[in-house]
């Protein structure tokens, strides 16, 4: 036995909920959502099989019911006007349905949403196109918390609950909290297809403005020659497990973090874009505008794949991700595939423009069959590590980084290899004992500039008479038994002959000395040697103590295996068969501690000893010594020396 109810179009007062449906038919309906509303014909008929308690809803011409056969999915209904297939609604959540609210147009369902909002609805079910049709909307402003649910999902098929932007509309859906007394929180899109009416349509599909806790989950956003999503003043939000495809143009793309509203803090903040699939699109797939100031952006575990060029192709070269501004961002564990200049004019993966600031992390990302740059850093600070590039079908080239930003960087070269596992590039070798200026700290923000011979793309340009950088020695060097050799890699900016000068200060109190940086000779190493008594608390401060600017690339720090010592020695004439001995060179002067001096080198001098025999005589176990000159001839010899140089080898 079954029951039939016929209702005039647009009249839904008798059965807009599960409860009223049960009252109408005097039967229990627990596991299905009852949905009924006037559609595009004069009536809608709703049937409930009393044996299964499953309601079926259909859109058909009036007629007397003759018979039907039903199952949990569909009902084959025979009437005097024909045979029709009706579908069951299997939604188990008791939430309002879009079709509970009637429309004033056969081609635009926007009114239904507006009525739902006015009714205070916070969750709204969107029926699948197989039962209703594509839900058509245009310039729909949602001004309060509203969650739109469907039974579609993230896939390239076009079935299930589908919201389609009307071609002539300037945008599709706008979650718009502008001017609200209470900022909307929550809401979003779940298990839905959101599409343009055709691939050539313009106008963004989704806009979010002045909203918090927005969620887009398990959706498919497709088919528009404009932005898929534009976000402004959107906070604590996420987009996950969603497909983006056939989106964008030369001037648009998939996701735009647009200009902030009012103040820089009214921006896109704490936004998670993760586990999404992106393909077949144009423009910048993720972009921030030059006045967006986004902060705490998480782009993680996404697949970016060029697998075809959509209707609106790129005209100018593009980066997949392009930041006009960015404060803090983490781009991790993503895959990029087949982005080349031949594939829709893609020149690289990440571009950070001059408006970027603070830190972007680019960690553990893979690029397959791409070309161009892995990162172009024109502004801000990039921390990059663990990134791999597989050349794949690209004939040649290795993806690395281009850096012109004046801020310090922390970039590890990309490891590049071919599909057979052959490594083709690991970037420039950096000595493990070398510490780049990028990784040193200080009180002055001396700007960086590009230099083809800099160790990490850019080097610090330091004006005269200012502190350059600082470095704190590790505790292993503060044991009172360590001798350190510190070398600074520097270059004099002046090319007209004025030398530069570099000073090393320890702990802000002790100057080790100043050394000359010779002008017009390129990069050079300035060496300082620290005895245990000079190391102190280990705070190294490098200062440009000269009158011209210098370039500072970084420092080498090594535990010394020797110490170079020199002292005044002017022996004068030495008689035949006689010898002369220098002043005692005490270990307290040379190194300052006991037990470190093991042996001595042969001395050398600043002049000629003219046949004299030279020897080093150890004075005690601690390493004090003399230098002796002996005349083995039958005539006096006068050496032309004033200074002696000797290397003391350490344990």
UniProtKB/Swiss-Prot annotation:
Active-site residues, Swiss-Prot/TrEMBL: 236, 295, 305, 307
Annotated spans, Catalytic: 100-428
Domain notes: Consists in a catalytic region, a carbohydrate binding region and a lectin-like region. The active site consists of catalytic dyads Asp-Glu located at the interface between 2 adjacent subunits. The lectin-like region is probably involved in trimerization.
Annotated region described as Lectin-like, given as residue ranges: 561-651
Family affiliation: In the C-terminal section; belongs to the K21-specific depolymerase family.
Organism of this sequence: Klebsiella phage K64-1
GO BP, sorted A to Z: adhesion receptor-mediated virion attachment to host cell; symbiont entry into host cell via disruption of host cell envelope; symbiont entry into host cell via disruption of host cell glycocalyx
Summary of the function given for this chain in its UniProt record: Functions as a receptor binding protein (RBP) and probably mediates the attachment to the host capsular exopolysaccharides. Displays a depolymerase activity that specifically degrades the K21-type polysaccharides of Klebsiella pneumoniae capsule.
Keywords: Degradation of host capsule during virus entry, Degradation of host cell envelope components during virus entry, Host-virus interaction, Viral attachment to host adhesion receptor, Viral attachment to host cell, Viral tail protein, Virion, Virus entry into host cell
Gene3D superfamilies: 3.30.2020.50
Gene: S1-3
Protein name: Depolymerase, capsule K21-specific
Cellular compartments annotated: Virion
GO CC annotation terms, alphabetical: virus tail
Chief location category: virion
Chain positions covered by the region annotation Carbohydrate binding: 447-560
SUPFAM superfamilies in the record: Pectin lyase-like
Record has ATP-binding as a keyword: no
């Amino acid at each position: 036995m079954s029951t039939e109810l016929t209702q005039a179009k647009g009249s839904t007062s008798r059965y807009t909920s599960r409860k009223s449906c049960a009252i109408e038919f005097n039967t229990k309906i627990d596991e299905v959502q009852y949905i009924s509303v006037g559609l595009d014909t004069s009536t809608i008929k709703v049937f409930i099989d009393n044996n299964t308690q499953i309601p079926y809803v259909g859109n058909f011409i009036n007629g007397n019911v003759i018979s039907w056969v039903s199952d949990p999915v569909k009902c084959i209904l025979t009437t005097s006007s024909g045979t029709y297939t009706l579908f069951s609604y299997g939604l188990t959540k008791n939430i309002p349905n879009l079709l509970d609210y009637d429309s004033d147009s056969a081609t635009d369902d926007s009114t239904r949403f507006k009525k739902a909002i006015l009714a205070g609805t916070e969750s709204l079910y969107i029926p699948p196109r197989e039962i209703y049709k594509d839900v058509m909307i245009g310039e729909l402003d949602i001004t309060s918390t509203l969650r739109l649910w469907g039974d579609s999902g993230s896939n390239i098929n076009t079935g299930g609950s589908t919201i389609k932007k009307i071609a002539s509309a300037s945008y599709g859906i706008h979650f718009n909290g502008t001017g609200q007394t209470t900022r909307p929180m929550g809401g979003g899109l779940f298990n839905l297809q959101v599409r343009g009416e055709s691939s050539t349509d313009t106008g963004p599909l989704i806009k979010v403005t002045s909203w918090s806790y927005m969620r887009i989950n398990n959706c498919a956003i497709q088919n528009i020659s404009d932005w898929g999503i534009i976000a402004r003043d959107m906070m604590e939000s996420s987009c996950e497990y969603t497909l983006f495809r056939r989106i964008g143009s030369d001037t648009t793309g998939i996701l735009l973090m647009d200009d902030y509203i009012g103040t820089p803090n009214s921006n896109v903040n704490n936004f998670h874009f993760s586990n999404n699939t992106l393909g077949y699109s144009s423009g910048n797939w993720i972009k921030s505008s030059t006045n967006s100031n986004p902060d705490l952006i998480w782009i993680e575990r996404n697949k970016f794949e060029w697998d075809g060029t959509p209707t609106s192709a790129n005209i100018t070269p593009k980066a997949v991700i392009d930041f006009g501004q960015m404060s803090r961002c983490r781009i991790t564990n993503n895959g990029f595939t087949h982005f080349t200049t031949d594939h829709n004019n893609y020149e690289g993966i990440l571009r950070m423009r001059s408006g970027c600031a603070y830190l972007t992390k680019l960690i553990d990302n893979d690029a397959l069959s791409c070309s161009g740059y892995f990162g172009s850093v024109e502004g801000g600070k990039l921390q990059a590590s663990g990134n791999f590039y597989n050349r794949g079908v690209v004939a040649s080239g290795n993806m690395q980084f281009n850096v012109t930003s004046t801020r310090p960087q922390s970039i590890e070269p990309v490891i590049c290899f071919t599909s057979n596992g052959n490594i083709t590039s690991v970037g420039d070798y950096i000595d493990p004992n070398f510490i780049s200026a990028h990784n040193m700290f200080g009180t002055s923000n001396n700007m960086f500039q590009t230099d083809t011979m800099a160790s990490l793309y850019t080097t610090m340009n330091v004006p005269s008479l200012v502190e350059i950088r600082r470095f704190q020695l590790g505790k292993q060097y503060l044991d009172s038994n360590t001798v350190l050799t510190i070398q600074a890699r520097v270059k004099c900016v002046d090319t007209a002959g004025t030398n530069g000068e570099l000073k090393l200060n320890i702990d802000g109190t002790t100057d080790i000395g100043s050394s000359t940086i010779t002008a017009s000779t390129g990069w050079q190493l300035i060496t300082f040697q620290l005895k245990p008594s000079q190391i102190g608390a280990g705070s190294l401060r490098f200062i440009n103590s000269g009158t011209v600017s210098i370039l500072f690339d970084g420092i080498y720090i090594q535990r010394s295996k020797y110490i170079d010592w020199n002292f005044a020695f002017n022996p004068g004439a030495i008689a035949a068969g006689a010898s002369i001995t220098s002043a005692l060179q005490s270990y307290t002067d040379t190194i300052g501690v006991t037990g470190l001096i093991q042996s001595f080198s042969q001395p050398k001098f600043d002049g000629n000893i003219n046949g004299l025999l030279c020897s080093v005589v150890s004075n005690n176990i601690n390493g004090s010594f003399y230098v002796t000159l002996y005349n083995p001839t039958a005539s006096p010899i006068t050496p032309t020396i004033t200074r002696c140089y000797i290397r003391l080898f350490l344990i």
